[in-house]
Swiss-Prot record:
The lineage of its organism: Bacteria, Bacillati, Bacillota, Bacilli, Bacillales. Pfam families: Urease_beta (PF00699). One of its GO terms (biological process) is urea catabolic process. This is Urease subunit beta. It comes from Staphylococcus aureus (strain NCTC 8325 / PS 47). SUPFAM superfamilies: Urease, beta-subunit (SSF51278). Keywords: Cytoplasm, Hydrolase. Heterotrimer of UreA (gamma), UreB (beta) and UreC (alpha) subunits. Three heterotrimers associate to form the active enzyme. It catalyses: urea + 2 H2O + H(+) = hydrogencarbonate + 2 NH4(+). One of its GO terms (molecular function) is urease activity.
Length: 136
């Protein structure tokens, strides 16, 4: 071993595995680009982003930590969201929650054929965030 050497596994790292997924269509109705980071509570994203906000409650983008999705003015794309894990408390952002997530408001798919997501896993579907949301 060489000092400072990093030895990694040759297997792929799965992120947000076994988290229910939701796919929504988002449109930037503003006149400036909007970027949303990986851990931002998507429900509280910029008001110029037009989407079904209630479906995004308690969720963040299903992308690697530190990454972001950019919406140019007029852009319309699908994004994949996953539920927050851990203590499920949200503070800051636009101040719309500031406390525990109200579980009764969290959208959860009812079956694998749900229009927006598969239940607990990708069921062979492709992560749409790599192109701009998840399609079977």
């Amino acid at each position: 071993m060489i000092p400072g050497e990093i030895i990694t596994k040759s297997t792929e790292v799965e992120i947000n595995n076994h988290h229910p997924e939701t796919v929504i269509e988002v449109e930037n109705t503003g006149d400036r680009p909007i970027q949303v980071g990986s851990h931002f509570h998507f429900y509280e994203a910029n008001a110029a982003l037009d989407f079904e906000r209630e479906m995004a409650y308690g969720k963040h983008l299903d992308i690697p930590a530190g990454a972001a999705v950019r919406f140019e003015p007029g852009d319309k794309k699908e994004v994949q969201l996953v539920e927050y894990a851990g203590k499920r408390k949200i503070f800051g952002f636009r101040g719309m929650v500031n406390g525990p997530i109200d579980e009764s408001r969290v959208y959860r798919p009812t079956d694998e054929n749900d229009e927006y997501a598969g239940v607990f896993g990708d069921n062979g579907a492709e992560n749409v965030n790599k192109k701009g949301g998840k399609r079977s």
